[in-house]
């Protein structure tokens, strides 16, 4: 599995949860995101390789889910953050169902304290390591 296949798999999973998908380095986020809810994938980083012609690769993944956040009550903000956390858990669980994905390790999810763009969105950010066959 290549990083392109992994990104496409994450695109399909995020789209299945009704998120508009975007992928580029984080500095492009303010100019690229034009609709919400949005999923932003930082290009996966190849962290480790085991084997020469076939074996395992470990990719570090950063996936952000964003929703409109202007004028939300504290209760509504907390509810939406909880929804996004559950969605991220679902996406990474579904990712392991692909036959080329061995496992997802070191998954951490945290709410962001400030907006990525000037739209005033709220977001949850997930980082994980995906171990895949090649």
Where are these regions (language model features)?
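A short, hydrophobic beta-strand-centered structural micro-motif
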Residues: 34-45
